[in-house]
Amino acid sequence: MGQTDDAGVVERYLACLAVHDWDGLAATIADEDLIREGPYCDVIEGKQRYLKFLRGVCASPEGYRLDVHRISHASDRVCYVELSETFEADGVPTEYPECLVLEQNPDGLINRVSVFIKQVRS
């Protein structure tokens, strides 16, 4: 197909994200036409801007942890990922459940990341 082994791109992206391996993560995302849509309707366009955003967000919080609960490959180019991000708020580990929609371009690289926050039941 393209430049990458499609079957493992999403899994490698998540593994690199969890350990803050930005060079490894960069190898899983498209150089062109990358768009990240956040849970608050925020949009980041471009590979370098997205990597800069991740470096700032993921490296800062105390006690940061990413746990992947389920990966569902809807097609050869679309994947849903249920995960949780945990970091300390006032010294207390706080978990934030999310769902990501990841889309891959014809070369197998991730070119679209959409982030949805799950609502915690009261």
Residue ranges and their predicted role:
Residues 2-5, 51-122:
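A beta-strand edge to alpha-helix "cap/lid" segment located at domain peripheries
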Residues 23-27, 31-71:
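A solvent-exposed, acidic/Ser-Thr-rich amphipathic alpha-helical stretch
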